Amino acid sequence: MKITAEMIKDLRQKTHAGMKECHKALQQTEGNIEKAIVFLREKGIIKAAQKQGRATSEGITNIVFDGNNAFLYEINSETDFVSKNEHFQQLVKVLGEIILKNQLSNAKDLLAFNYQNKTVQELLLEKTSVLGENITLKRVLKVTKKPQESFGTYKHQGGRISVLVVLKNDCPSVSEDIAMHIAASKPQFLTPDKVDPTFLAEEKKILHKQTAKELSDKPAQMIEKIVENRLGKMLKDMCLSEQPFVKNADQKVKDYLKANNTDVVSYVRWEMGN
């Protein structure tokens, strides 16, 4: 398969690896970007955290509520300047009202919804003309809780990051603290037992190849033990329950929750552009 300059550019943006390394990775994986990323990680050229990449656009994430339902949505613009514009802010408000009133739970339904004799998609095109930048709706998500459960939220930088937490009971101060922690610490999973087995197996495979390369003179049993230790540390960093609480690094999140007689049922962390 021919490796094009565009393919190399795409892989470099995702991994920050060098041009030669990206070209080789693409050759080895027959042009498959995702497999090329894994190839680079196995070679130790990039770190796991870089796989997710960075935000590439501006805009706002927001959360609106209706009883036991919460709706998250993200609207994008090309620049931060426009996202702070009065017209853009009003658009965010209007879309939130439409979502709530009509209980719209995905972007497709919202874009097709008829509002004041035009679809929301047409409304976005109008705003694009007014603001001089491409304005898009990226995503919508509905989260429903049980009556005895409670919502907690935290917004950072006016909506660059929005976090929604569901606690098993009503603990306003705790839910706000946990939401703030999630915004700062970026957990990928709730608890170790909630980690996707496929993800775990892939991570272990990559760690094993990296470790075997670093310690090629060590016996297989020792390498396996080191891999298990590294995997355990990685899970502690990724799982909300195991992370050091942002307000008290000597206390794990799960211990903070236990001390307050509550627990996290679920959470959503959205970062604008990701």
UniProtKB/Swiss-Prot annotation:
Keyword vocabulary terms for this entry: Cytoplasm, Elongation factor, Protein biosynthesis
Nucleotide-binding recorded as keyword: no
UniProt region (Involved in Mg(2+) ion dislocation from EF-Tu), positions on chain: 79-82
CC per GO annotation: cytoplasm
Keyword Transcription regulation: no
InterPro entries in the record: EF-Ts_dimer_sf, Transl_elong_EFTs/EF1B, Transl_elong_EFTs/EF1B_dimer, Transl_elong_Ts_CS, UBA-like_sf
GO MF term set: translation elongation factor activity
Main location: cytoplasm
Subcellular location(s) per record: Cytoplasm
Domain of life, per lineage: Bacteria
Alphabetized HAMAP family for the sequence: EF_Ts
Cited function: Associates with the EF-Tu.GDP complex and induces the exchange of GDP to GTP. It remains bound to the aminoacyl-tRNA.EF-Tu.GTP complex up to the GTP hydrolysis stage on the ribosome.
Family membership noted in the UniProt record: Belongs to the EF-Ts family.
Name of protein: Elongation factor Ts
Gene: tsf
